[in-house]
Amino acid sequence: METLLVVGAGPKALAVAAKSHVLRNLGLPAPRVVVVEAHAVGGNWLPSGGWTDGQHRLGTSPEKDIGFPYRSTWARGRNQAINAAMKEFSWTSFLVEHGTFAEWIDRGRPSPHHHTWARYLQWVARAIDLDLVIGTVRSIRQGDNGWSVSVADAEGRDTELTADGLMITGPGRSTRTLAEHSRILSIAEFWELAGRRALPAASRAAVIGGGETAGSALDELVRHEMLTISVISPMATIYTRGESYFENALFSDPSKWAALSMQERRDVIRRTDRGVFSVRVQENLLGDNRVHHLQGRVVRVADHADGVAVTLRNELRADQVHTFDLAIDATGGQPLWFLELFDSYATDLLELAVGGPLTQSRLESSIGYDLAVSGLASKLYLPNLAALAQGPGFPNLSCLGELSDRVLSPEPARAGSGARRLVVR
């Protein structure tokens, strides 16, 4: 692979680009990495990305940076040199260069605000001279020798980029809502209004979603004057992310993942990653008696006086209708958001590779050791869908160094058991 095109200039893109930079400097083979980003490096951690106001704190330790866990297995005899070179782009190196390392230690190693995390990613991008294209991806097609990606700049002019490999990152659009209604805000609208202190007056508010996106929105809402704040999610309760050594070790070191059954893997992901709030957010909400949980899936939205009526469905009881003055769609990113960019031929090839119509479960089960869809002639890396097949740390910030090792590995099939397709039942 000579060229790898990455969609989205977030932590995963920076991890792969930095590792490629290090490998090349050490005289080892690595592809040229080109990154396409609509906003800015680290844009989803800034207000411009629509997923945050930039003022809330990172849900994980910043020491899990673009090189973590600094345990490269890329090239026998050269791994220590790779690890040492990657440490030049670590979170602590960023703090040392800016003269804030001692203060950060003395304050107890706090998680940084989102905007500070974005600054760290931008610092890495400058240090490695990131090959960055600012623009919006319009379409993706597969040609004779790889991928062809159409990118529109700020003035609407299209540029065609070609690459041997393609990696998709990011959560998709932050402007999506469950339904078109004046009292239902997308997460982008919510953060834009919250940043201007212009949220609509509301006595009864609801946050739809049970993951970290919803947790951050709740963390903001409790700072506003509201009588009740309801959290709507299909889970029986709002779970807290496990932060013990045993749970964290599965995220940092996915080597034991292949030995777990499918049910055990799903249990780990459900209990520790999907639909959970961070410990810090849960502690902030603990003493606020305005916050309550409503179990169910939203199946209908309708007008109601000056607000919105939301119908919740549960398997074991009749539908329930609740009314709110304001609701925020914080269900988070859409795992398959990128499929709408693929042309019909690329879609057909992808369906042939996964063995049927494109569903999340089929794509998840097709992810090989190198975090790419198995069976495609041109590599398509989907780390955000790699949790079930390869390990729970790949879709998030838990093992970015391992992620870059696998994507850039010259022997993607060397871990035979991890590369075969899973049978999902």
Where are these regions (language model features)?
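Tryptophan-centered motif/residue detector
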Residues: N44-L46, W91-F94, W123, L336-W337
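A conserved beta-strand/loop capping segment in the N-terminal third of enzymes
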Residues: Y70-W104
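Residue-level signal for pocket-adjacent positions within structured domains
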Residues: S61, A84-M86, L185, R362
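Conserved N-terminal glycine-rich FAD pyrophosphate-binding loop of Rossmann-like flavoproteins
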Residues: H39-G77, I238-S255
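Alpha-helical interaction segments
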Residues: T60, K64, A81, R107-P110
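Amphipathic alpha-helical interaction segments
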Residues: D53, G59, R78, I82, ...
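Flavin (primarily FAD) cofactor-binding/catalytic cores of flavoenzymes
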Residues: M1-A40, E103-R425
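Generic hydrophobic, aliphatic-rich segments that mediate packing or membrane embedding
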Residues: P62-A75, K87-S90, W117-Y120, V133
